[in-house]
């Protein structure tokens, strides 16, 4: 097991390398530079699309127990879900099946190549309720007040502009909408991920409440990740 963990740690450190010119180009001069460090946390770089096969590796379900994560989301048919940092669709395709044809998944990524991989995978499975969206580093381009659940799996720590992204996500939520945040546990040294790609609960709570969110639920039964649910701090009760 130790050998497997070591190999995994090496692998994840390899696939997060960013090459020039691969992230969606930004033309808005108003986009500020990334702070680099946010509330004491160094911001990680975005994973390059050449690492996409790692996202759908055979061992991912066993290592992360994605089936349990999906059950914990409590999704209903007909809901609108935004999968931000969707990559090549490991969760997107499953989400689309859960919400059914009457629901929709807005799949957001900042790399066109990732979205092309996703489109190919969706077409191969005949899934038609996915809306691919090319976002930017400050805006996931979600329709305001329309999303039931925003899913962030191992991606928030890579947001180069966390405050702008959280503000945009907050605007996209319905009055009872939720954000499901999954991040590798920084508190657990046995989780074979580089520290830069982990977050502690304490750090998460340093970042979300000041940006207009309240913690409403925690799920602690995943092998490697925290799963924390947030709503707008002014959210109405269901």
Model-predicted regions and their roles:
Residues 26-82:
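Class I SAM-dependent transferase core
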Residues 81, 150-151:
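Hydrophobic beta-strand segment of the Class I
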Residues 82-139:
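Class I SAM-dependent methyltransferase SAM/SAH-binding core
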Residues 96-97, 163-178:
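A short glycine-rich, Lys/Arg-flanked "PGG" loop and its adjoining helix->strand segment in the class I
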Residues 140-149:
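A short acidic, Gly/Pro-enriched loop at the edge of an enzyme's catalytic core
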Residues 216-238:
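Core SAM-dependent methyltransferase catalytic element
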